[in-house]
């Protein structure tokens, strides 16, 4: 005699389906919560209104010259350097490569180690440099590489352009140190530079600040702090291809991915990652919200800034960071300008004197700084 079929298998199947449903709901809730935090707490305001074309455009021809072709070819060595290198050693390899890139060049300047109130640095002095005419230079390198040594082709030129002393600050880098320490080091160096020159304690007659890429970000952040702290403002400042928005919202980050031969290969994989995940990664990495003006100067109060010049390439990934910053600063009433070049790589000014466009850009910088400086005594 056949008995009634047991209900246990059906109950077990129903239980399994319920468990799966609960798991799916839990995952959706967690992912939705993470997404909501990124969008409403980490991303900040939509700044697409500041995507208007702005600035002076420079070009030495309709097509790239042979010199920029040679520079781009040399950048291809980076990929070869990293081939087969474990992730944990990549920073060390890139740091060594960047520091040694321009070794052996005859710069014609004097290099003097400096202790900027506890922060190491390097004075760069062209012949006849006025020690009371001072520039604080903040190097780039994605906050993880670079040094005064790596940027001597720029700091030596700034000393000649201004006729003064350049202090290249050796701020602390990630990941060995928190992101905030680099900001603090630049602030200390600026305070110190106001009252100390290469020949000892003495007030500065003229003060400039300049930086490139990550150093441009630190430069713009420093300007906000100097204003809010009531310190003597620099007479003028320069930012070369700066990162201005740590929320990574600028359209050119994706639009110029394939036209940027320097940043594209290094950061291209990030373009495939959803922005909300990048926001979380940035927050966890720096312990600072990506939309915090401390690391996103684009999102700060941009009124009452000193005369400021930004230079950027129209084909680099960070171009819109500059364009948005200048549009927003001008709307706030600050004397901020953008100069744009076609066909150039990120921070092409460092490739001087071989690049004609680098020489042209540096000439513009010299004219800008000297026009803003107080008369020489």
Predicted regions and their residues:
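Alpha/beta-hydrolase superfamily serine-hydrolase fold, recognizing
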Residues: 25, 29-45, 110-377
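Leucine-biased recognition of intrinsically disordered, low-complexity hydrophobic segments
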Residues: 2, 14-15
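A glycine/proline-hinged amphipathic helix-loop "lid/cap" segment
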Residues: 18-126, 374-377
């Amino acid at each position: 005699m056949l008995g009634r079929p047991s209900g246990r298998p059906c109950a077990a199947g129903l239980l399994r389906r319920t468990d799966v449903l609960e798991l799916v709901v839990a995952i959706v809730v967690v992912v939705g919560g993470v997404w909501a935090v990124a969008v409403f707490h980490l991303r900040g305001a939509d700044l697409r209104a500041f995507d208007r074309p702005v600035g002076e455009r420079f070009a030495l021809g309709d097509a790239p010259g042979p010199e920029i072709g040679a520079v781009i070819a040399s950048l291809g060595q980076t990929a070869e350097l990293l081939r087969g290198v474990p992730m944990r050693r990549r920073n060390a390899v890139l740091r060594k490569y960047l520091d040694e890139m321009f070794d052996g060049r005859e710069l014609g300047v004097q290099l003097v180690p400096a202790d900027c109130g506890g922060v190491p640095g390097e004075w760069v002095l062209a012949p006849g440099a006025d020690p009371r005419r001072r520039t604080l230079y903040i190097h780039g390198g994605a906050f993880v590489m670079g040094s005064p040594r790596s940027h001597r082709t720029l700091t030596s030129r700034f000393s000649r352009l201004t006729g003064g002393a350049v202090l290249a600050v050796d701020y602390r880098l990630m990941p060995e140190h928190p992101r905030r320490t680099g900001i603090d080091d630049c602030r200390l160096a600026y305070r110190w530079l106001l009252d100390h020159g290469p020949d000892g304690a003495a007030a500065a007659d003229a003060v400039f600040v300049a930086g490139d890429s990550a150093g441009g970000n630190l430069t713009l952040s420093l300007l906000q702090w100097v204003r809010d702290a009531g310190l003597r403002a620099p007479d003028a400042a320069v930012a070369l291809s700066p990162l201005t928005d740590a929320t990574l919202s600028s359209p050119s980050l994706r639009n110029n991915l394939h036209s940027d031969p320097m940043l594209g290969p290094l950061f291209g994989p990030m373009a495939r990652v959803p922005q909300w995940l990048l926001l979380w990664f940035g927050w966890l990495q720096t312990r600072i919200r990506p939309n915090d003006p401390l690391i996103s100067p684009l999102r700060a109060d941009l009124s009452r800034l000193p005369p400021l010049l930004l230079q950027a390439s129209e084909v680099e990934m960070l171009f819109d960071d500059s364009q948005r910053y200048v549009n927003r600063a001008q709307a706030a009433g600050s004397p901020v300008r953008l100069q744009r070049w076609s066909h150039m790589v990120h921070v092409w000014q460092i490739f001087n004197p071989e690049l004609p466009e680098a020489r042209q850009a540096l000439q513009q910088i010299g004219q800008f700084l000297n026009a803003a400086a107080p008369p020489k005594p």
